[in-house]
Amino acid sequence: MPVCLLVSEDNSHKPIELHHQQSVTLGRGPDTKIKDKKCSREQVELRADCNRGFVTVKQLGVNPTLVDDVVVGKGNQVSIKPGQSLYMVNQQYPYSVKFTEDTSRSKPSKRAQQIQSPTKTTADVSDSPPPPKKTTPPAGEKSESAGHWSQGLKASMQDPKMQVYKDDSVVVIKDKYPKARYHWLVLPWQSISSLKALRSEHVELLKHMQRVADQMVEQCPDAHKLSFRLGYHAIPSMSHVHLHVISQDFDSPCLKNKKHWNSFTTDYFVESQDVISMLEHDGKVQVKEGAGELLKLPLRCHVCGKEQTTIPKLKDHLKTHLPS
């Protein structure tokens, strides 16, 4: 049976061996050489499926663990395969996984806090990729990345009921949980996981995405009385690059918490033109360090800057700025 190795991409330590269906808890400590106190001592739980060639990553720590710039989220889990990158915390300390038939050549380090996998409960089966030939995935579960919600865009962009525009390069869909009266997503058909994966060769594609977004705004029946912004989340919650086209009324029942609000009204929301400019000048997109902390900022009105203590109070205040 193949053996899985967790490999530090910055070569800070020897590969860590992950045995088949055995849980390994990792974080700050001697095994990873991580000393950053923002990384919990028990930041992630990893479980390798050596037969099927993936590793399940469950975030245990408070600060974000990412897979290809997609936040896992505390208590959530996703799958990682060879070719993807796992960032232990806050887009730092990158790892990849490797499956090999003979571990004697690699001499991996001692496994950290390894625990023999207990018998799966019903909850375990619903939350993680099923073991081979034993459990049927729950109804409606998607095969890619164990059907995790972060992969939902890839299904939505193929759904004719969700599409409002498409051409050979892009598709526009309605956001499933709109945070304003008008909220669309422009997605390329080309598979691009995140802002971090963008390069200078993608400039023309992103310019086309922006032109399509501008057309959506121009065709909106309320464009004469509502303002719009076009941009990307610094650390997206969904896999696959997508450009938000969102009206600035934020009049929606789906806007429910501080993270929702701050993701569209702080520097966490990166303007489309700024992303294009970074690619033209630097050949890549630089996400500011600590961008995730912006989601914790106080609630402030995006129009007048007045601070509000709760989402309901913020929504009441926003009504004073709505066009008549």
UniProtKB/Swiss-Prot annotation:
Residues in a coiled coil are none
Keyword line: DNA damage, DNA repair, DNA-binding, Hydrolase, Metal-binding, Nucleus, Zinc, Zinc-finger
What is the gene called? aptx
Please give the residue ranges the record annotates as the region Disordered.
100-160
Catalytic activity as recorded in UniProt: a 5'-end adenosine-5'-diphospho-5'-2'-deoxyribonucleoside-DNA + H2O = a 5'-end 5'-phospho-2'-deoxyribonucleoside-DNA + AMP + 2 H(+); a 5'-end adenosine-5'-diphospho-5'-ribonucleoside-2'-deoxyribonucleotide-DNA + H2O = a 5'-end 5'-phospho-ribonucleoside-2'-deoxyribonucleotide-DNA + AMP + 2 H(+); a 3'-end 2'-deoxyribonucleotide-3'-diphospho-5'-guanosine-DNA + H2O = a 3'-end 2'-deoxyribonucleotide 3'-phosphate-DNA + GMP + 2 H(+)
Gene3D superfamilies, A to Z? 2.60.200.20, HIT-like (3.30.428.10)
Q: What class of enzyme is it?
A: hydrolase
Boundaries of every FHA-like domain copy: 23-72
Q: Its biological function?
A: DNA-binding protein involved in single-strand DNA break repair, double-strand DNA break repair and base excision repair. Resolves abortive DNA ligation intermediates formed either at base excision sites, or when DNA ligases attempt to repair non-ligatable breaks induced by reactive oxygen species. Catalyzes the release of adenylate groups covalently linked to 5'-phosphate termini, resulting in the production of 5'-phosphate termini that can be efficiently rejoined.
Give the molecular function GO annotations.
DNA 5'-adenosine monophosphate hydrolase activity; DNA-3'-diphospho-5'-guanosine diphosphatase; double-stranded RNA binding; mismatched DNA binding; single-strand break-containing DNA binding; single-stranded DNA binding; zinc ion binding
The residue ranges flagged as biased composition, category Polar residues, are: 111-125
Using the UniProt annotation, give all residue ranges assigned to the region (Interaction with DNA substrate): 175-179, 237-238
Biological processes annotated in GO: single strand break repair
Enzyme Commission code: 3.6.1.71, 3.6.1.72
Motif extent (Histidine triad motif): 240-244
Q: Residues of the signal sequence?
A: none
Q: Where is this protein localized, as stated in its record? A: Nucleus, Nucleoplasm; Nucleus, Nucleolus
Q: Which InterPro entries match?
A: FHA_2, FHA_APTX, Histidine_triad_CS, HIT-like, HIT-like_sf, SMAD_FHA_dom_sf, Znf-C2HE, Znf_C2H2_type
* Protein name from the UniProt record: Aprataxin
Q: Where is the HIT domain?
A: 150-255
